[in-house]
């Protein structure tokens, strides 16, 4: 698999490409399947339909990897926090974490109840062309904890930060609990057919530098080390969003570092390019205009060159109203321009 080879710095005929949120509303096929499912959560839990939407961008865009269609919040859901996705508001937990008892009362063994995820991965792998990689994923303990404490997305993370500074032992207990579940969850995904796994730290930028490494990076490193220790042939990818100022402190046992669009690729390369394969980092909005998109591709490929050590991706997820024809052109351009 070209994608897996790139994760381990092996020679590839071109720079491989996949896109975060490549299965999504910019595809009419996705919207039709989503309607069929009835709700977003129902789509995540329906093996047949989740397989269908995972495969759609592989067939339409010809990307080099499929990423499991699911949501990072299925883990706290299976830990006993009722979850709903509200139109225009996003995910919301009807019960939240505010004290040690709430953490202790979380249901153990969530990874055992996520069989619909494992079944979906097995289904995808059986239908995916053998040369295409299958990526599994989870959210970071910190990012999941913020949702569990706030109850939904937040601009200030006030409750999470209040807990961090006033009662850090509660937050650390929650982070440790999540970390242990996520190790076993990713392991289950690998056993079900995932060829690589990615940890999304969507709310990394909410924390100042030293606090970030104590309350987020530490736990991601621990999960990555667990997976690499048991499955050295499986690439582990980390995507911490918005930590351009912290790159000099990045360390750990993982393979691929995802670069968000707010971080200059040249900066990431200067700090991390010899230690990790870099993934990214086209600004998704460039896909609104084909010429702007092509300029962005050229800039990134000029920095990264045609050398080993780069996987092309967006610096964040696909937007719902991006033109599908530009997404198709993006994959074609990257493949053509990066030919060895």
Swiss-Prot record:
Signal peptide annotation: none
Record gene name: hemE
Reaction(s) catalysed (UniProt annotation): uroporphyrinogen III + 4 H(+) = coproporphyrinogen III + 4 CO2
Record-linked InterPro entries: UROD/MetE-like_sf, Uroporphyrinogen_deCO2ase_HemE, Uroporphyrinogen_deCOase
Keywords recorded for this protein, A-Z: Cytoplasm, Decarboxylase, Lyase, Porphyrin biosynthesis
One biological process term in Gene Ontology: protoporphyrinogen IX biosynthetic process from glutamate
The name this protein goes by in its record: Uroporphyrinogen decarboxylase
Source species: Helicobacter hepaticus (strain ATCC 51449 / 3B1)
Keyword Cytoplasm found: yes
Enzyme Commission number: 4.1.1.37
Pfam (any one): URO-D
PANTHER family recorded: METHYLTETRAHYDROFOLATE:HOMOCYSTEINE METHYLTRANSFERASE RELATED, UROPORPHYRINOGEN DECARBOXYLASE
Pathway it works in: Porphyrin-containing compound metabolism; protoporphyrin-IX biosynthesis; coproporphyrinogen-III from 5-aminolevulinate: step 4/4
Subcellular location, principal: cytoplasm
Annotated compartments: Cytoplasm
Entry keyword annotation includes Lyase: yes
PROSITE patterns attached to this UniProt entry: UROD_1, UROD_2
């Amino acid at each position: 698999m070209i994608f897996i080879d790139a994760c381990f710095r092996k020679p590839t005929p071109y720079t491989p490409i996949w896109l975060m949120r490549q299965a999504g509303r910019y595809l009419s096929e996705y919207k039709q399947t989503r309607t069929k499912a009835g709700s977003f959560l129902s789509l995540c839990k329906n093996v047949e339909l989740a397989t269908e939407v995972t495969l759609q961008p592989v067939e339409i865009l010809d990307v080099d990897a499929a990423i499991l269609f699911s949501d990072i919040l299925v883990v706290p859901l299976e830990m006993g926090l009722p979850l709903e996705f509200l139109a225009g508001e996003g995910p919301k937990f009807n019960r939240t974490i505010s004290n040690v008892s709430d953490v202790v009362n979380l249901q153990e063994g969530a990874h055992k109840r996520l069989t619909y995820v494992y079944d979906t991965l097995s289904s995808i792998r059986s239908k995916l062309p053998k040369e295409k990689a299958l990526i599994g994923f989870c959210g970071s303990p910190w990012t999941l904890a913020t949702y569990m404490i706030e109850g939904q997305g937040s601009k200030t993370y006030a409750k999470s930060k209040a807990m961090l500074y006033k009662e850090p032992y509660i937050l650390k207990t929650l982070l440790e609990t999540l970390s242990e579940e996520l190790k076993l969850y990713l392991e289950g995904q690998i056993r079900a057919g995932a060829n690589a796994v990615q940890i999304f730290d969507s709310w990394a930028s909410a924390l100042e530098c030293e606090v970030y490494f104590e309350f987020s990076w530490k736990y991601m490193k621990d999960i990555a080390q667990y997976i690499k220790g048991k499955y050295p042939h499986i690439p582990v990818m980390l995507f911490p969003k918005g930590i351009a100022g912290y790159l000099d402190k990045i360390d750990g046992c993982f393979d691929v570092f995802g670069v968000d669009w707010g971080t200059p690729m040249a900066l990431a390369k200067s700090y991390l390019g010899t230690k990790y394969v870099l993934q990214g980092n086209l600004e998704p909005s460039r896909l609104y205009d084909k010429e702007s998109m092509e300029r962005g591709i050229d800039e990134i490929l000029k920095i990264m060159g045609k050398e080993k050590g780069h996987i092309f991706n967006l610096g964040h997820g696909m937007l719902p109203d991006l033109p599908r024809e530009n997404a198709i052109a993006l994959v074609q351009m990257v493949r053509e321009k990066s030919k060895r």
